[in-house]
Amino acid sequence: MKKTRFVLNSIALGLSVLSTSFVAHVAQATLPSFVSEQNSLAPMLEKVQPAVVTLSVEGKAKVDSRSPFLDDIPEEFKFFFGDRFAEQFGGRGESKRNFRGLGSGVIINASKGYVLTNNHVIDGADKITVQLQDGREFKAKLVGKDEQSDIALVQLEKPSNLTEIKFADSDKLRVGDFTVAIGNPFGLGQTVTSGIVSALGRSTGSDSGTYENYIQTDAAVNRGNSGGALVNLNGELIGINTAIISPSGGNAGIAFAIPSNQASNLVQQILEFGQVRRGLLGIKGGELNADLAKAFNVSAQQGAFVSEVLPKSAAEKAGLKAGDIITAMNGQKISSFAEIRAKIATTGAGKEISLTYLRDGKSHDVKMKLQADDSSQLSSKTELPALDGATLKDYDAKGVKGIEITKIQPNSLAAQRGLKSGDIIIGINRQMIENIRELNKVLETEPSAVALNILRGDSNFYLLVQ
């Protein structure tokens, strides 16, 4: 039997798509007559649509232009050939290509001109232009971003006469609540579609190191909708439209949005600190299933199973143990490990939280203060392009200290430079390092890193990265 291949698509729109003419007919969810006494969403939309904008971006994308010849040279020898050899016989290894793209965004502060969107909409942009529903255009600058949560905040230059959107409490959402998606699909202009909340706490299973705790909706969402608004029937923001799953790249009734509470927490951190300071609970685990529930004598069928509690972590200090099952955070139900992972990461370091967990069939409540996730600070504090797209954590095992690469995003600079998941970085520019903090210190004095000392299996070699 032939399997259908489903693809997770970010939904920003490259302008090259516009050169292809097509018309797609898709089934559209409709709101039943009992929603309210009103027979139209128009009054609500008239207030909300001016707060949803279109972002046009221009920039230069980095692409790998190395000759395949260099790929045949063992990693341990490449360092000794030097830059001149690579330029003469293999190309410079990196080139830039102009790109343009379209996406959507939401005005969240009218007086200051703040617009919330997805990171993948503005990633790599040198120029950002924001167009309002009334046709006015503003130049914009990037205020801050968080790649792992796919959130970015931009600010309009000289904002005036803007409309902002109000945040809803996304923790109060229920499956079956009505949703309205607003954005600019395929560059056609602002478009409104409707549906319901299909699922909450959804993860796509992506292996990219991102934090996923999506609202799933069947409202029609297509390319160009990225960064646009998902609102409730009161016109309040419940999510930022981010991705779709589709066999064809178009709407298939499965769309994902970042919850408004999660986005709001990230924006507050960006405005306060200039970066996202992730919280760290200090647990490892997975999803609760029927077999685990039976083995650990609990009746719950949903929750986050704790398989390991890290030493000296917030979780250990609060008394959590391996085998505990977390069922709620701050009074809100936890359905999966991915959900609590995302909520902890976006809550912020130093924040106090409460957890409800099951142990030996009994429910317990505990409060704790989250620690800082130092591994999440690398992209904000350093300028080492070769590590773009790599998820890092401190490594201390088997008598070796360094930085472990736990995940590599496909087609990222880290992947292009030859880094692989499982690599251990133990040195930079011939200086030994034992953790991410030491790497940051080296880069403060030597920002132009040229070589990383890598342990890969039984191999110890230098990898040329500049």
From Swiss-Prot:
Alphabetic keyword roster: Hydrolase, Periplasm, Protease, Repeat, Serine protease, Signal
Transmembrane segments: none
Pfam families: PDZ (PF00595), Trypsin_2 (PF13365)
Matching SMART domains: PDZ (SM00228)
Domain PDZ: 270-361, 367-458
Cited InterPro entries: PDZ, PDZ_sf, Pept_S1C_Do, Peptidase_S1_PA, Peptidase_S1C
Protein name: Probable periplasmic serine protease do/HhoA-like
Segment forming the signal sequence: 1-29
Single GO MF annotation: serine-type endopeptidase activity
One GO CC term, this protein: periplasmic space
Domain of life (superkingdom): Bacteria
GO annotation terms (biological process): protein quality control for misfolded or incompletely synthesized proteins
